[in-house]
């Protein structure tokens, strides 16, 4: 895998076969040109959206590479890129959301398999969550490398199925929402668990419960099944997306529902959500008839 690859176009989908024989340096130069062009166009679209505020205007849609066919959670880095992953392999990919370019990928030792559903970053640690509540902790690495990891079992796997994980920096804790209750009696609520860092003390875990009627609001949903959760960088509220309902809710850390609405645009299977520090909403869709994509919108608080 080359350190930088474009994810919208195939490398050899070029006017001539000679282009496929370019040197790595020439290909890198071409990618830099594409990146510059896309950033310029994105800036133009942002300016146009800001000239007509009021709606979450679509800014760009990037097709993801085959290894992200089942793209899942999203986690923003301090440098403005985003970490994401496929939900069947313990491999992390870094993408520039402003250009749709895949920068690198690395994995946990042994190419771990499993139902990995969410990702977050806390300091220098990366966390991957399995649907059974087990959390894998490891470090960022260079392209193609494998890194050691540790595993923490939250003990919540018998109670819930999970697909969301976020780092709440103000409280130094991990936040995860129950997607589906596994007991026979569904409590009809949105339940959000919070685990203080460092992990290890189950007794320190807390949760908030939000009645499902408040979550649904005026929407025609019958329930709400969280597929990812992230923190709004501006007001620190929880932004929770649900693939089945194709909508999202904004909830305060105290459990108050601020808003509940359908996602903008056309989303076949939205699995990840994040908000950048410059007010761009990112939504990832895994392949479902159409290829996997990362869509950008102007975020409207």
Residue ranges of predicted features:
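Bacterial N-terminal signal peptides that target proteins for export
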Residues: 1-7
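C-terminal motif of bacterial Sec signal peptides marking the signal peptidase cleavage site
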Residues: 17-19
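Sequence/structural signature of beta-propeller domains
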Residues: 21-301
């Amino acid at each position: 895998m080359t350190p930088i690859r474009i994810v919208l176009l195939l490398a050899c989908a070029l006017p001539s076969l000679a282009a496929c024989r370019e040197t790595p340096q020439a290909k890198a130069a071409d990618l830099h040109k594409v990146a510059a062009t896309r950033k310029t166009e994105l800036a133009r679209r942002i300016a146009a959206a800001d000239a007509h505020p009021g709606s979450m205007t679509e800014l760009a849609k990037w097709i993801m590479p085959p290894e992200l066919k089942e793209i899942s959670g999203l986690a923003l880095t301090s440098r403005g890129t985003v970490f994401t992953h496929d939900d069947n392999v313990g491999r992390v990919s870094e993408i520039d959301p402003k250009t749709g370019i895949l920068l690198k990928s690395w994995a946990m030792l042994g190419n771990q398999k499993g139902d990995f559903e969410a990702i977050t970053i806390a300091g220098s640690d990366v966390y991957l969550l399995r649907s059974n509540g087990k959390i894998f902790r490891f470090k960022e690495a260079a392209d193609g490398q494998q890194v050691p990891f540790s595993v923490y079992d939250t003990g919540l796997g018998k109670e819930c199925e999970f697909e969301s994980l976020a780092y709440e920096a103000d409280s130094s804790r991990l936040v995860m929402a129950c997607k589906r209750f596994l007991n026979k009696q569904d409590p009809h609520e949105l339940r959000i668990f919070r685990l203080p860092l460092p992990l290890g003390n189950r007794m320190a875990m807390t949760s908030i419960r939000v009645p499902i009627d408040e979550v649904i609001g005026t929407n025609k949903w019958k329930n709400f099944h969280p597929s990812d959760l992230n923190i709004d960088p501006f007001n620190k509220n929880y932004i929770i997306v649900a693939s089945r309902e194709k909508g999202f809710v904004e909830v305060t850390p105290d459990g108050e529902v601020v808003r509940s609405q359908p996602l903008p645009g056309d989303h076949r299977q939205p699995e990840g959500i994040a908000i950048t520090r410059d007010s761009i909403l990112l939504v990832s869709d895994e392949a479902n008839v159409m290829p996997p994509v990362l869509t950008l919108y102007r975020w409207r608080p």
